[in-house]
């Protein structure tokens, strides 16, 4: 009798657990939670966490609550693949990540093999979506678009000037630098210096000496905020006054913290600041109430979760392939970063880059400000 009761209780607990699991849908967030890009990892993690909290409060997705597993890829491709395999083993269906293009690409292959849909809020290398994969999307733009904006700006405002181009040898950094050079070439310009550095280095004195010798009037940087900040600081230390210009990889307040006062005047390409959009007002207030400023990729990560929810509800399914089909269909999604729709590759259909300049704010802090009409020459 006791054995029968024990078996009955065990069966009851198993059914309860199964019922709980069936009432949930598992997401993963993969990004650099630690390492040199940890500030961006925090943006992504907070963006996903807040979106999940808000969606769950409103009833979840198709009546199921979202659970999230967080994976730290440390901006390393091998670790990204390890995280992807762990997510697959744990039954994750949807992933928001990764940050670095060079991590996203091998990770997305693991996700495809395991039927998992991935949306990156930050990986901008064109090849992320040029591999004819059903499962990879992004909420950001592409480097060929970003490079076109940067190169066109250089041709218009630095015609006849000397341009040095420096990159960090990564898929993202070198790719962005090369796309910018292509756009410059269309305007009859080419760099006087083209150099690659190693991520993680601290001493860029040799590089700065080359920049100084080149007589560069502008230094274009293809890379992230840590190395970019160090390069600017060391340029100023050696008396190089040429402004820096970079891409969305420097959109973090950490750039100014690392680079110091010398980052003022830095030019940058990035999407229109989503914090200023009416659609984001309530969510931005939620973040600020928690003492977290939703800069850079925070809202792009939040938007990724919103897209999955809306596509799943339109598809009336939580099967990743059916959700992907709905996303590829041209459906419009209402998100905190504005309306989005996707092409067959998984790219957003809007051109998403404008010009910014880093300048001192009334509170004394140096941060990035969108230039009216993308003309930073009019900014005082």
Sequence positions of predicted segments:
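Extracytosolic ligand-binding ectodomains
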Residues: 2-13, 22-380
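Phosphodiester-processing cores and adjacent nucleic acid-binding clamps
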Residues: 18
């Amino acid at each position: 009798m006791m054995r029968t009761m024990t078996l009955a209780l065990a069966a009851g607990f198993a059914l309860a657990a199964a019922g709980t699991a069936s009432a949930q849908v598992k997401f993963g967030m993969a990004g650099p939670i630690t390492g040199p890009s940890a500030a961006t990892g925090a943006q992504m993690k907070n963006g996903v966490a807040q979106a999940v909290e808000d969606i769950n409060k409103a009833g979840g997705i198709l009546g199921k609550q979202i659970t999230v597993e967080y994976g730290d890829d440390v901006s390393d491709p091998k670790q990204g693949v390890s995280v992807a395999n762990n997510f697959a083993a744990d039954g994750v269906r949807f992933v928001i990540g990764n940050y670095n293009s060079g991590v996203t690409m091998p990770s997305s292959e693991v996700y495809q093999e395991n039927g998992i849909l991935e949306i990156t809020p930050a990986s901008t290398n064109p090849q992320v979506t040029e591999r004819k994969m059903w499962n990879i999307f992004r909420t950001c733009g592409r480097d060929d678009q970003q490079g076109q904006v940067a190169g066109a700006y250089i041709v218009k405002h630095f015609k006849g000037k000397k341009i040095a181009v420096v990159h960090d040898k990564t898929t993202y950094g070198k790719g962005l630098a090369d796309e910018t050079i292509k756009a410059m070439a269309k305007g009859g310009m080419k760099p006087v210096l083209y150099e690659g550095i190693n991520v993680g280095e601290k001493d860029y004195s040799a590089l700065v000496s080359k920049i100084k010798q080149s007589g560069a009037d502008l230094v274009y940087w293809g890379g992230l905020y840590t190395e970019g900040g160090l390069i600017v600081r060391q340029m100023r230390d050696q008396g190089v006054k040429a402004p820096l210009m970079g891409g969305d990889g420097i959109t973090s307040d950490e750039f100014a913290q690392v680079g110091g006062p010398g980052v003022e005047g830095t030019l940058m390409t990035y999407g229109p600041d989503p914090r200023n959009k009416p659609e984001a007002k309530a969510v931005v207030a939620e973040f600020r109430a928690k003492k977290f400023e939703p800069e850079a990729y925070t809202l792009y990560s939040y938007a990724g979760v919103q897209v999955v929810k809306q596509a799943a509800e339109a598809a009336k399914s939580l099967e990743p392939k059916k959700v992907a089909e709905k996303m590829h269909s041209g459906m419009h999604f209402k998100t905190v970063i504005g309306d989005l729709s996707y092409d067959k590759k998984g790219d957003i259909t809007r051109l998403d880059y404008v010009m910014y300049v880093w300048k001192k704010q009334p509170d004394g802090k140096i941060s990035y400000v969108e230039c009216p009409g993308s003309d930073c020459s009019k900014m005082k």
